[in-house]
Amino acid sequence: MRLTVVGSINLDFVATTPRLPRAGETVTGATLARHPGGKGANQALAAHRLGASVYMVGRVGDDPVAEEALRTLRMEGVNLDYCNPLAGHSTGLAMIVVDDKGENQIVVAPGANAAFDAEH
């Protein structure tokens, strides 16, 4: 099966903490990890791992973060021919805080994802 996924590509920063902070509050986190993410990239990777031949269509910036955001997709064999860097833009970033119950808060700086258009 061949599949094309159109969507966001980000680098995620994930912090775990016993509980989520309230407005204006600082809490101490247990861990901080960074890894490739984005709704589109996650779907492309999942479909590929289930056996599909996947083409990812998305935007990354022309910054050092772009390669890190694409690394897992590339290493696992997702086709990235339609994920060329966009000059003058940063790659999307997500800040994710997860508590002990699995609840989360997410802030996304979309970067090049926001510049995606029909001509891409």
Region locations from a protein language model:
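Short C-terminal domain-edge/linker segments immediately following a structured domain
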Residues: 33-40, 87-89, 113-115
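Residue-level detector of anion-binding/catalytic polar loops
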Residues: 53, 79, 103
